[in-house]
C-alpha cells in the first residue's frame, strides 16, 4: 500500500430479521445471500490523489476494530487493578472484547453467560485456552455481573441484558449497542465515553429509515409489509451513543 494519507469507507449489506424465542427474548439476525453468509467491505482511497488503493473483506477487520475500541476504553477508564471480567454474550464480538481486556489489564478470571448453555461452555473452553486464564461459564446474567471489575455486553439482544442496580462502584462497563443497556444505568456512571457519531446522512421515507435495528448508523429499507416487522426506532437514553459505549 502506498504512503498515506488515506480515507476508508465501510459498506455492509444485510438482510435483517428479528426472531423471538419461546421465553420472549427478541434478537436481531443478519445475513447476506443466505443465512450463515456475510458481506462487509472496506474500500481504501488515497486522499492525496483520490485513487482507490484496496478493497478488503472486513469479516475479521471489523471485529478487530470494535475490539480495539473496547480495549482503549478499558486501558484509560478501567481500574489499574482490574482482574475480573463478566461477559454477557458468547459470539464473535464477546471474544473480541475479552482479548483486548487481557492485553491492557492483568485479567485472571472471566465469567461468561449466554442463554445458550452449549455456547457459553464452548466459549469458556476456547477462551481459557487462548488467553491462559480461568473462564467460568455461569447460569445467569446476574452471576456473570456480580463482583467483576469489568462488565462487557456483546449480544444481539433488542432489550437490556442486565439491570442497572447490578452495576457496582468502580465497575468499568463496555456495551456493544445501546439496546443492551438499561436507561437507568446512566445515573450510576461517573463518566460516559462513546465513539464518534458520524454517519451517512440520507433522506428518510416510510420505506427507508435509520436507527431501527441494533446499529444506529444503518439504514433499513423494504416494502410496506416488510417495514411493519421492523423494530421501533432506537431508544434515546440520556447518554445516547454509537457502539461500543464505555463507562
Residue ranges and their predicted role:
Residues 133-148, 164:
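Short acidic low-complexity segments
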Residues 103-131:
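NAD(P)-binding Rossmann-fold cofactor-contacting core
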Residues 186-247:
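Adenosine-phosphate binding glycine-rich loop
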Residues 146-147, 168-169, 188:
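Alpha-helix C-terminal capping/helix-to-coil transition sites in glycosyltransferase folds
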Residues 150, 157-172:
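Rossmann-fold NAD(P) dinucleotide-binding segment
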Residues 89-91:
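Glycine-rich Rossmann-fold phosphate-binding loop(s) that bind the pyrophosphate
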Residues 1-63, 71, 81, 230:
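N-terminal ligand-binding/catalytic initiation module
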Residues 77-84, 106, 168-169:
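Short helix-loop-beta connector
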Amino acid at each position: 500500500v502506498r504512503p498515506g494519507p488515506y480515507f476508508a469507507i465501510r459498506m455492509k449489506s444485510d438482510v435483517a430479521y428479528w426472531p423471538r424465542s419461546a421465553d420472549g427474548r427478541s434478537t436481531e439476525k443478519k445475513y447476506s445471500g443466505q443465512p450463515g453468509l456475510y458481506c462487509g467491505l472496506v474500500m481504501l482511497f488515497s486522499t492525496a490523489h483520490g485513487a482507490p488503493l484496496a478493497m478488503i473483506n472486513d469479516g475479521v477487520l471489523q471485529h478487530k476494530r470494535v475490539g480495539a475500541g473496547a480495549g482503549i476504553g478499558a486501558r484509560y477508564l478501567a481500574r489499574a487493578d482490574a482482574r475480573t471480567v463478566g461477559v454477557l454474550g458468547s459470539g464473535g464480538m464477546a471474544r473480541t472484547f475479552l482479548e483486548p481486556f487481557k492485553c491492557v489489564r492483568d485479567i485472571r478470571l472471566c465469567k461468561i453467560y449466554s442463554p445458550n448453555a452449549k455456547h457459553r461452555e464452548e466459549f469458556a473452553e476456547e477462551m481459557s485456552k487462548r488467553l491462559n486464564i480461568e473462564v467460568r461459564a455461569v447460569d445467569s446474567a446476574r452471576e456473570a455481573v456480580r463482583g467483576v471489575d469489568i462488565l462487557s455486553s456483546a449480544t444481539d439482544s433488542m432489550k437490556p441484558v442486565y439491570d442497572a442496580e447490578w452495576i457496582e462502584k468502580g465497575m468499568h462497563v463496555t456495551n456493544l449497542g445501546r439496546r443492551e443497556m438499561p436507561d437507568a444505568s446512566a445515573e450510576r456512571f461517573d463518566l460516559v465515553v462513546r465513539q464518534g457519531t458520524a454517519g451517512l446522512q440520507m433522506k428518510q421515507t416510510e420505506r427507508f429509515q435509520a436507527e431501527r435495528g441494533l446499529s444506529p448508523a444503518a439504514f433499513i429499507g423494504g416494502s410496506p409489509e416488510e417495514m411493519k416487522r421492523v423494530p421501533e426506532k432506537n431508544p434515546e437514553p440520556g447518554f445516547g451513543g454509537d457502539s461500543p459505549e464505555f463507562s
